[in-house]
């Protein structure tokens, strides 16, 4: 199990990403726009740098919804490989069965 503080930190990052997503996309659009003036583009870069560091989506880490484990995460289920296996063996994941050939 991951520490509670790590889970809380990830939750905080998720909130910040959601809060600043629109602002971040607007600023990035200005930065990429070649028709915008150099001054406007530079101002957009500076404003983007002023946003909180944790508001960047690349700072988020995929974690298991049950244990908080950061490695062996399966996006399709939102769980770590260990918990996916446990739930699959109990038959709690619809349509998932153990392979045999």
UniProtKB/Swiss-Prot annotation:
Entry coiled-coil feature ranges: none
Gene Ontology cellular-component terms listed: cytoplasm; small ribosomal subunit
GO molecular function: rRNA binding; structural constituent of ribosome
InterPro entries xref list: Ribosomal_uS14, Ribosomal_uS14_bac/plastid, Ribosomal_uS14_CS
GO annotation (BP), single: translation
Keyword Phosphoprotein included in the entry's annotation: no
Keywords per UniProt: Ribonucleoprotein, Ribosomal protein, RNA-binding, rRNA-binding
Domain of life of the organism encoding this protein: Bacteria
NCBIfam families in the record: PRK08881.1 (NF006477)
Assembly and binders: Part of the 30S ribosomal subunit. Contacts proteins S3 and S10.
Protein role: Binds 16S rRNA, required for the assembly of 30S particles and may also be responsible for determining the conformation of the 16S rRNA at the A site.
Family: Belongs to the universal ribosomal protein uS14 family.
PANTHER family documented for this protein: 30S RIBOSOMAL PROTEIN S14 (PTHR19836), SMALL RIBOSOMAL SUBUNIT PROTEIN US14M (PTHR19836:SF19)
Designated name of the protein: Small ribosomal subunit protein uS14
Originating organism: Aeromonas hydrophila subsp. hydrophila (strain ATCC 7966 / DSM 30187 / BCRC 13018 / CCUG 14551 / JCM 1027 / KCTC 2358 / NCIMB 9240 / NCTC 8049)
């Amino acid at each position: 199990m991951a520490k509670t503080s790590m889970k809380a930190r990830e939750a905080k990052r998720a909130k910040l990403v959601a809060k600043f997503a629109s602002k971040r996309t607007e600023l990035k659009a200005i930065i990429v726009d070649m028709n915008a003036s150099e001054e406007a583009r530079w101002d957009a870069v500076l404003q983007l740098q002023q946003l909180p560091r944790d508001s960047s989506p690349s700072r988020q880490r995929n974690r298991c919804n049950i244990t908080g484990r950061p490695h062996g995460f399966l996006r399709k289920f939102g769980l770590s490989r260990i918990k996916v296996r446990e739930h699959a063996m109990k038959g709690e994941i619809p349509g998932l069965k153990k392979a045999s050939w």
